[in-house]
Curated annotation (Swiss-Prot):
Listed GO biological process terms: cellular response to lead ion; lead ion transport; phytochelatin biosynthetic process; response to lead ion
Active site: 30, 42, 152 (acyl-thioester intermediate)
Induction: Induced by lead (Pb) stress (Pb(NO(3))(2)).
Keywords for the protein's UniProt record, in alphabetical order: Cytoplasm, Stress response
Main location per the UniProt record: cytoplasm
Pfam families for this protein: LRAT (PF04970)
GO cellular component, as recorded: cytoplasm
Name of this chain's protein: Protein LEAD-SENSITIVE 1
Length: 259
């Protein structure tokens, strides 16, 4: 892996790796946890998802492995009760390129990766613990799929860190969810600052600054509203209804002060 690309060869995969592959012309990526023996555990939409009612739903439907009519002899039939599934690596990639998500990156590295959903400032737990969490959630589920609060990237980041956002009105861990809506929001919120400059380059720099600040502030490794919740406790709370997926308002994205 390098500064500009997280692409890796299959030979370098280790159990516990958080991997992903781009879908739909690089608009969105599908994420999962490699658990060894050519297997990937990942979170998909299986008819229980909370959608947006927008074109994003069509994009995210295609983020998971394609459901073709050819039966894969090595893949485990999915549990229809929840969206956590185990697939072979080929089915997970669905013809795409393999990438590895990075953890414990520094601030400069994080901001250079302008596209969200490729790295985080958060520290990952040991790989054997990551695999245990993924396998536990395969048996017990990860709640209801939500585009912004509980998607495949949120699942993989949780398996790696056990960190959860506890405040229901804010966004989940997903960096690519912030990227999808962060750009338009940055453009809107930087509009008042355009009064301070008529230079087109200054306007662009302002919008980029707001976008980068929002990505940095909402990264799971920087947020103050997160807690470590182990998988057994998480699934117990999910089954008892103590955790619920709610639609977060866009205003929940942290932004820099203009004062």
């Amino acid at each position: 892996m390098g500064l500009l690309s997280n692409r890796i060869d299959r030979s370098s995969l280790k159990p516990g790796d958080h991997i992903y592959s781009w879908r739909t012309a690089y608009i969105y990526a599908h994420h999962g946890i490699y658990v060894g023996d050519d297997r990937v555990i990942h979170f998909t939409r299986r008819g229980q998802e909370v959608g947006t009612g927008t074109v994003l739903d069509l994009i995210l439907v295609s983020s998971g492995p394609s459901r073709n009519h050819t039966h894969c002899p090595t893949c485990v039939p999915p549990n229809e009760g929840h969206g956590v599934v185990s697939s072979c690596l080929n089915c997970f990639l669905a013809g795409g390129v393999l990438y590895r998500f990075e953890y414990s990156v520094n601030a400069a590295h994080f901001l250079v990766k302008a596209r969200g959903g490729t790295c985080t400032l958060a520290v990952a737990d040991p790989n054997e613990i990551v695999v245990h969490r993924a396998k536990h959630l395969l048996q017990n589920g990860f709640g209801c799929y939500d585009v912004f609060k509980n998607n495949c990237e949120d699942f993989a980041i949780y398996c790696k860190t056990a960190l959860l956002v506890l405040e229901g009105r804010t966004m989940g861990q997903s960096g690519q969810a912030v990227s999808i809506i962060g750009g338009p929001i940055a453009a809107v919120l930087s509009t008042p600052m355009r009064l301070l400059t008529t230079n087109v380059y200054g306007m662009a720099a302002t919008a980029i600054g707001v976008y980068c600040a929002s990505r940095y502030a909402t990264d799971i490794g920087m947020r103050a509203d997160v807690a470590k919740v182990e998988a057994e406790d998480l699934t117990r709370r999910l089954s008892s209804g103590l955790f619920q997926v709610l639609d977060p308002p866009l205003a929940a994205i942290a932004l820099p002060s203009t004062s």
